[in-house]
Amino acid sequence: MKKPFYKVLYVQVIFAIVVGVILGHYYPSLAVDMKPLGDGFIKLIKMVIGPIIFCTVVTGIAGMQDMKKVGRVGGKALLYFEIVSTCALVLGLAATHILRPGVGFNIDPATLNGKEVASYAAKAHGQSSVDFLMHIIPNTMIDAFAQGEILQILLIALLFGSVLAHLGERGRVVTDFIDGITRVLFGIVHIVTKLAPIGAFGAMAFTIGKYGVGSLVPLLKLIGTFYLTSVVFVLVVLGAIARFTGFSIIRFVGYIKEELLIVLGTSSSEAALPQLMEKLEKAGCSRSVVGLVVPTGYLFNLDGTNIYMTMAVLFIAQATNIELTWMQQLTLLAVAMLTSKGASGVTGAGFITLAATLAVVPTIPLSGMVLILGIDRFMSECRALTNIVGNGVATVVVSAWEKELDRAKLRAALSGNGEAAAGEAARV
């Protein structure tokens, strides 16, 4: 029996977002007080992200038997991430050259006050490549889970799963126990997800109430350029990859619409991570691939952030009438490929990575970031949406490369008949 439309989660989330926008516009002081609703929902989701990643990766690797496969899957995922991330960076650069959203501002860099972005610049200079690599190793196992550090948890899970795979039948009891914990954790996610409309309402009301719709007007061209470029990236770049793999990007986006709406309402791609992992398994991707690709993708495959990076730098250059040589732009691409890695989960990640990138192109003033500080919050939704679609597609692609994609389940899921096909398992 079909649910009444008002009981469907994505309908509830859409309604909550609309109400949040209305409240934020007409009653901004009250709307700002709604912030704890959004923050609380995201905290509830983050509460289970670490344990879910640990359990999913451990059970996936423990069932692989062949440990060479773990390295193979990881290698293929990283290769895919680099290729697609580069496409996103180049597309952001090309779109800004074509649409020229910064032309006409004629801003004198000397008049810009960089105090508002000083904290982001300090964070950007504060972490070197060595610091980043050392940060992957936790002080203790407990500390990794307590801090919610995805890379650290992933490292622990890889080691734990590898040992269980080596033990074979002797480790079966532990593997079965962790698998049972996984089911409990996803049950918790189902309960928490029902609160998504409340979280989306609170986050959207706060955003509109604090920043106001009026703050968008002067920079609408940049916002429009970014949103348009992201749509083109999803439909053309990811669409071509999806078609080559044997599925429709439009149907895939429709399949994860609830997760996308949660991301839209909360501006956090992490808010939908557990649900995305579960849906990808239901769509025929193997648990081992989902467990490895999705968490690493949230750190190394930030397509939306990559588009934003090159676009923001070139926008600042155009707005301040600074001409960049092709060599400087190629340097920008190379640096952005490095600075964007591992940015997910860091407060103000977009601005921190942008500051790190600008530091390598000294002709563009760091204070130019002030120009987009006010609208960054409105662009974060698009970044997060593009990131989650990109990671979903990446997981399906790597599963197909590994011949661990159940195409019968995938077709059924994307056509809306996932449950009916649940029993069909024809690995291809």
Swiss-Prot record:
Keywords: Cell inner membrane, Cell membrane, Membrane, Symport, Transmembrane, Transmembrane helix, Transport. It is a multi-pass membrane protein. The keyword Protein biosynthesis does not apply. GO terms for molecular function: fumarate transmembrane transporter activity; malate:proton symporter activity; succinate transmembrane transporter activity. The chain crosses the membrane at residues 8-28, 44-64, 78-98, 148-168, 184-204, 222-242, 307-327, 355-375. One of its GO terms (cellular component) is plasma membrane. It is found in: Cell inner membrane. Disulfide bonds: none annotated. InterPro entries: C4_dicarb_transport, Na-dicarboxylate_symporter, Na-dicarboxylate_symporter_CS, Na:dicarbo_symporter_sf. PROSITE patterns: NA_DICARBOXYL_SYMP_1. One of its GO terms (biological process) is L-aspartate transmembrane transport. The keyword Transmembrane applies. Pfam families: SDF. It comes from the Bacteria. Belongs to the dicarboxylate/amino acid:cation symporter (DAACS) (TC 2.A.23) family. PANTHER family: AEROBIC C4-DICARBOXYLATE TRANSPORT PROTEIN, PROTON/GLUTAMATE-ASPARTATE SYMPORTER. Responsible for the transport of dicarboxylates such as succinate, fumarate, and malate from the periplasm across the membrane. This is C4-dicarboxylate transport protein. The lineage of its organism: Bacteria, Pseudomonadati, Pseudomonadota, Betaproteobacteria, Burkholderiales.
